[in-house]
């Protein structure tokens, strides 16, 4: 049965960073489009390696997303690891580890696995201290994308049936993107290429991997004050509960 994957059970709480009542296993979400890059002195915020990466980014949105994810990860370190409270931001560095297919943050000799996601300006970050099987994904729900055509080309037949069953375009889109974020999250949790998880039935794959999944949708206002809907899914070990916080502000 697949109904529970569509019940929007993932906890997403809107809050300010200063009021964050942070427990472990938390995912921070933030609209990076609200960042003004000129408000930040990048050499103070980013390591020399990170500076080379952000300088390669061409679009302002890509720069905003990169800066936001790195700053959020570093503030998470300071909140969850009191011994690093006074460590300068530019002394922490994020680098992708090819062997594990994980983005890792290097902090005073410690190496911590992370997970990030971004879609159309909305970013999310989490720290995975115990290196457990965990992944999450964010995706903008777009009615303009040919999601039915994409599903029929890439998805499992059972998934296609779930997508085409609803009679409204919105419901079909919601189902398509929920399945998509579950596949992406599973790929991150298991360090498998997403290309290997497109055609298999994601619900069977989750069951075989003995992993849990929960999801929800959130609405964020864009620069024109239009509401944009995003789907968020988390895949994790059954013994661990994750929750999300949508931040309304940012630390400078």
How would you describe each model-predicted region?
Residues 1-252:
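Core catalytic alpha/beta fold that binds nucleotide/phospho-ligands
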